[in-house]
Amino acid sequence: MKITFLGTGAAIPTKYRAHPSISLKFDGEIFLFDCGENTQRQIIFTDVSPMKINNIFITHLHGDHVLGLPGLLQSIAFQGRKKPLNIYGPAETVKMIEHILGVGYHSIDYPINVHEISSKTPERIIFTNNYEVFSYPVVHSVPALAYVFKQVKKPRMDLEKVKKLGIEIGPDLKRLKDGFNVELNGEIITLNDVTLPPKKGICVGYSGDTIPLKEFAEFLKELKCNTLIHEATFDKTMERNAKETLHSTATDALNIAKLSGVSTVLLTHISARYDNLNAFENEIVEFKAENPEIHVLIAEDLMEYSLK
């Protein structure tokens, strides 16, 4: 699994930080979280294939998180896309996509399925054999969501148990692997009888724009998340601004990481007011002095982070 930060800025882009967008590559598929202006151009400088984007997750409908959609949707149409594209987002996402498709002379021939999430509670929005995705309602100036991507690990076959039960490699073992029970010497054998608990999979949370939420941290902990991408629009001296605009400071994000039990936190959505990251780095040093076990990084545009 690999995370690529396409844009790590906030409301106003800078020379060094584009509007928010994050790519997550898993099992040959690309999952895109937010799509700020310039996303499709940022992709050019990475190994992200826009044609492999099947799911786009929008945290909220502020322009800095969605204005890259019109260009991206049309560009992949020009490249010959035919397979459906799923777009997930909060209330009014359907209307926004309708407006995008109604402006200009678009030639989009592939299906776009829009999934509007209005739930005020956490929701599992995708479930497959290999991964699941959850939405979590957060607090911002407009309806907003956080997302969690979780790898699904299957139980591991315990060959010692298989041997002990006298199951030979063949049809019976295949049926067990497929989830069916097998009768052997008058005894019913189930998959649980011959497997070990699955290993812990990779789990990544993305806060979107939000105030620090203890409840979100608890949700991440419940899902056993090991990586958190959290907005850090301001440094802690701007705490008042963060509260007024319903954003988070770097210290807020770090504290949420600690509460959630993750091993890594990646800070993003940095305000254009900062010419350097000294204030953020000082907060990280203070935090690491008491929490050395947590890996902290400030994301930069086009930065890649691999997870195993």
UniProtKB/Swiss-Prot annotation:
Binding site for Zn(2+) 2: D64, H65, D209, H269
Catalytic residues (UniProt): D64
Entry annotated with the keyword Zinc: yes
EC number, as in UniProt: 3.1.26.11
Free-text cofactor note: Binds 2 Zn(2+) ions.
InterPro entries recorded: Metallo-B-lactamas (IPR001279), RibonucZ/Hydroxyglut_hydro (IPR036866), RNase_Z/BN (IPR013471)
Broad enzyme group: hydrolase
GO MF term list: 3'-tRNA processing endoribonuclease activity; zinc ion binding
Reactions accelerated catalytically: Endonucleolytic cleavage of RNA, removing extra 3' nucleotides from tRNA precursor, generating 3' termini of tRNAs. A 3'-hydroxy group is left at the tRNA terminus and a 5'-phosphoryl group is left at the trailer molecule
Binding-site list for Zn(2+) 1: H60, H62, H140, D209
Keywords from the UniProt entry: Endonuclease, Hydrolase, Metal-binding, Nuclease, tRNA processing, Zinc
SUPFAM superfamilies xref list: Metallo-hydrolase/oxidoreductase (SSF56281)
Cofactor(s) in the UniProt record: Zn(2+)
Subunit structure: Homodimer.
Role description: Zinc phosphodiesterase, which displays some tRNA 3'-processing endonuclease activity. Probably involved in tRNA maturation, by removing a 3'-trailer from precursor tRNA.
Family as reported in the entry's similarity comment: Belongs to the RNase Z family.
Name of this chain's protein: Ribonuclease Z
Species, as recorded: Methanococcus maripaludis (strain DSM 14266 / JCM 13030 / NBRC 101832 / S2 / LL)
